[in-house]
From Swiss-Prot:
Domain Helicase ATP-binding as annotated: residue spans: 33-209
Broad class of where this protein is predominantly found: nucleus
Location of the motif DEAD box: 155-158
Gene name of the encoded protein: DBP8
Keyword Thylakoid listed: no
Protein name: ATP-dependent RNA helicase DBP8
SUBUNIT field: Interacts with ESF2.
EC top class, as a word: hydrolase
């Protein structure tokens, strides 16, 4: 049976992994680590929770330890929380070697980040927008070292290769060595057409061919076999009452859960409503200052909060192994988003539940999801109409009303409205 040493990782790194109680490589690690160490570009696709981070961090750290220079590798990822999580893993793995890791994301001090970059960290973990800002506005003493980077990693590559990130990604890549002078590693849980098209790109002169690997899941279902998928038919106007009843029913009253919503406004309403109802709750969405986002995650990981209300900021890659329940409070329009959300539970062989709240408007979305995952959802009987009306409706309605009044008083969402107005004004001036 293969171990990390036989895959080619440095002895010091295998000892670090052992100290973290990671002794057996996963399928994607077995496949990708030797190929990356050979110098090949790599596209790695695997289910969530399969160990993709170590698949690229392991060989990068091994090569760095042979030639420990500054700005050795750049990892780009779509969200701040993912960047911080990846940085934590790099730091933990390289702790015995005095590794310097810099996190460059929005919501943090630009000045402090510029100072960090001037110190030439060994690895930069960044979101494209903030790194692009430094490249465009900082001097050569800050970002000039990027031109010597040996590795570029796109984590959650299917998201980074969309039009949303196109301009910032292009700016980041422009500051790095050309393709034939660096290794490019793409990792994702969803192999999209854009990712596949890169497999057919011509091989760079003097470089070995690209290595592409995708773990096939049982029956081509992109979700863990230990995940139970259910739905509840819910009237739109009383969703909050159904949620409260579900979270406080006998089966789930002591379990950790992530509640996924489509809008920041919904996340904030639910957080405040559940807090009024004395549920230990935290939230994670783009309208929160970065420090609050970080604190929310820490509270949830430490079980100070039992429930995390989140937009899709939390659906990608975040490793919170103890999540026992995922609730799709709002159904996503993209079936792959459902897969990523549901992948926050039933990780590493554990059992988990994913329950979707289905209103009359969601039927076509549920059918699309079932087609994508090749599995039918079953209706759960954990919450009944009569139970909701009898136990929850009155107090939940009161708590929601008080939450909405408080949000109105605080002008929640005003910053976002002003930003949108500025963008629209700018478009008007250009047209």
């Amino acid at each position: 049976m293969a171990d990390f040493k036989s895959l080619g990782l440095s002895k010091w790194l295998t000892e670090s992994l052992r100290a973290m109680k990671i002794t057996q490589p996963t399928a994607i690690q077995k496949a990708c680590i030797p190929k990356i160490l050979e110098g090949r570009d790599c596209i790695g696709g695997a289910k969530t929770g399969s160990g993709k981070t170590i698949a690229f961090a392991g060989p990068m750290l091994t090569k760095w330890s042979e030639d420990p220079s500054g700005m050795f590798g750049v990892v780009l990822t779509p969200t701040r929380e993912l960047a911080m999580q990846i940085a934590e893993q790099f730091t933990a793995l390289g702790s015995s070697m005095n590794i310097r890791v810099s996190v460059i994301v929005g919501g943090e001090s630009i000045v402090q980040q510029a100072l960090d970059l001037q110190r030439k960290p060994h690895f930069i973990i960044a979101t494209p927008g903030r790194l692009a800002h430094h490249i465009m506005s900082s001097g050569d003493d800050t970002v000039g070292g990027l031109m010597r980077a040996k590795y570029l990693v796109l984590d959650e590559a299917d998201i980074l290769l969309t039009s949303t990130f196109a301009d910032h990604l292009a700016t980041c890549i422009s500051a790095l060595p050309p393709k034939d002078k660096r290794q490019t590693l793409l990792f994702t849980a969803t192999i999209t057409d854009q990712v596949k098209s890169l497999q057919n790109a011509p091989v760079q002169k003097g470089k070995p061919p690209l290595f592409a690997y995708q773990v096939e899941s049982v029956d081509n279902v992109a979700i863990p076999s230990t995940l139970k998928i259910e739905y509840i038919l819910v009237p739109e106007h009383v969703k909050e009452a159904y949620l409260y009843q579900l979270l406080t029913c006998e089966e789930y009253e002591n379990k950790t859960a992530i509640i996924f919503v489509n809008r920041t406004m919904t996340a904030e309403i639910l957080r405040r409503t559940l807090k009024q109802l004395e549920v230990r709750v935290a939230s994670l969405h783009s309208q929160m200052p970065q420090q609050e986002r970080t604190n929310s995650l820490h509270r949830f990981r430490a079980n100070a909060a039992r429930i995390l209300i989140a937009t899709d900021v939390a659906s990608r890659g975040l490793d919170i192994p103890t999540v026992e329940l995922v609730v799709n409070y709002d159904i996503p329009s993209d079936p792959d988003v459902f897969i990523h959300r549901s992948g926050r539970t039933a990780r590493a062989g554990r059992i988990g539940d994913a329950i979707s709240f289905v209103t009359q408007r969601d039927v076509s979305r549920i059918q699309a999801i079932e087609d994508r995952i090749n599995k039918k959802m079953t209706e759960t009987n954990k919450v009944h109409d009569t139970a909701v009306i009898r136990k929850a409706l009155t107090k939940v309605t009161k708590a929601k009303r008080e939450s909405l009044m408080a949000m109105q008083k605080e002008n929640f969402g005003e910053r976002k409205r002003q930003q949108k107005k500025k963008q629209n004004d700018g478009k008007s001036l250009r047209s």
